[in-house]
């Protein structure tokens, strides 16, 4: 049997089918990170879209945001970039629900040109608006902070805050988020329902790799305006933090 020749019409149809395949062309996606712990305002926060990147074949565009709240202290961490994961619609939920320390996340993977274009916290705001408010407080209080240990969570910046009635355990851990250019280590301290790791079941949030080490720090180290950094326990904690950053 001789070679088969395609007619011009058949060739055009074949080329059109090939060009329509989702993996026939690499995507262009926004590239960005966020790591904010000071003056966090959900209504004012804006994610600037200043850079883009060309993804590998079969990769999609991802955007993942994590909002952490402990008493009056807050943090926003995020990642935009390429992802090998299958596409999924926006997923907004509490990883750890209030009362007490809470962690909310937004994540999605899409496969159209610069589709990871989220610039605000509206999805998290809507989630918080649907969550019942905790009004009853207890007589317990805990040292509270969310932030980098060398900046917003220096010993003198850690405050003691009253706990909700159903979250009276004092929690402290060192957390590391890694994804693309995002590489942030921070302290997470506040009132919680349990002493166990809040990220025990969340080693990845989208493409963000999460590592957590529980800290054992005496609450007394943070009361008053003394010099807790001279305490052996505080020195051990700082040593762990520097080792964790490496």
Swiss-Prot record:
<feature type="signal peptide">
    <location>
        <begin position="1"/>
        <end position="26"/>
    </location>
</feature>
<dbReference type="Pfam" id="PF00021">
    <property type="entry name" value="UPAR_LY6"/>
</dbReference>
<dbReference type="InterPro" id="IPR051899">
    <property type="entry name" value="Fert-Immune_med_protein"/>
</dbReference>
<keyword id="KW-0677">Repeat</keyword>
<dbReference type="GO" id="GO:0098552">
    <property type="term" value="C:side of membrane"/>
</dbReference>
<keyword id="KW-1003">Cell membrane</keyword>
<feature type="propeptide" description="Removed in mature form">
    <location>
        <begin position="226"/>
        <end position="246"/>
    </location>
</feature>
<feature type="glycosylation site" description="N-linked (GlcNAc...) asparagine">
    <location>
        <position position="117"/>
    </location>
</feature>
<feature type="lipid moiety-binding region" description="GPI-anchor amidated alanine">
    <location>
        <position position="225"/>
    </location>
</feature>
<keyword id="KW-0325">Glycoprotein</keyword>
<dbReference type="GO" id="GO:0044853">
    <property type="term" value="C:plasma membrane raft"/>
</dbReference>
<keyword id="KW-0336">GPI-anchor</keyword>
<protein>
    <recommendedName>
        <fullName>Ly6/PLAUR domain-containing protein 4</fullName>
    </recommendedName>
</protein>
<dbReference type="InterPro" id="IPR016054">
    <property type="entry name" value="LY6_UPA_recep-like"/>
</dbReference>
<keyword id="KW-0472">Membrane</keyword>
<keyword id="KW-0732">Signal</keyword>
<dbReference type="InterPro" id="IPR045860">
    <property type="entry name" value="Snake_toxin-like_sf"/>
</dbReference>
<feature type="domain" description="UPAR/Ly6">
    <location>
        <begin position="142"/>
        <end position="223"/>
    </location>
</feature>
<keyword id="KW-0449">Lipoprotein</keyword>
